[in-house]
Design a protein with these regions (language model features):
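N-terminal start-of-chain detector that recognizes signal peptides
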Residues: 30-33, 50-54
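Key DNA-contact positions within bacterial/archaeal DNA-binding proteins
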Residues: 37-41
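Positively charged, aromatic-accented nucleic-acid-binding surfaces
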Residues: 1-27, 31-34, 61-124
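DNA major-groove recognition helix of helix-turn-helix
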Residues: 43, 47
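Short Lys/Arg-enriched helix C-cap and helix-to-coil transition segments
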Residues: 51-65
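Short, charged/polar low-complexity linear motifs in solvent-exposed/disordered segments
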Residues: 48-49, 97
Length: 124
């Protein structure tokens, strides 16, 4: 599986690869400079509150035919970033909001909310 990993430098520069973002819990915790238990807790809360669907945001990846691990999508990484309070998560949130604001050179952001009981979610 070709997967991209987000990096955040010490001075807050965010780099998102061109490959689809799929990151392990350890990679997410390294990017946001938190302990792995904080990432696990955030993921559990996001799934428990049905903010995101596990089927859409998590994949099982097998490496070298033996080691299996879970990876999470960009959507999950963004959701986690909004639950943390670190310098890196703030830099990432600012990066995401700047990208949303700069779409088509406009400063307006339109958010559409689905009020469905089965899969509540937000789309931009």
């Amino acid at each position: 599986m070709d997967r991209g990993i987000i990096t955040i430098s010490k001075n807050g520069v965010v780099t998102i690869p061109t490959a689809p973002v799929w990151m392990t819990q350890q990679e997410i915790s390294d990017a946001f400079n938190v302990f792995g238990c904080d990432i696990r807790r955030a993921i559990h809360a996001i799934y428990k509150n049905m903010e995101l669907s596990e089927e859409e945001t998590m994949r099982h990846v097998r490496q070298n035919g033996r080691i299996c691990y879970d990876v999470y999508s960009l959507e999950m990484v963004v959701a986690i970033a909004f639950r943390l309070r670190t310098k890196e998560s703030v830099a990432f949130r600012r990066f995401i909001m700047d990208k949303l604001r700069s779409v088509n050179g406009k400063n307006s952001v339109y958010l559409f909310f689905s009020l469905s009981d089965t899969h509540p979610r937000c789309t931009c």
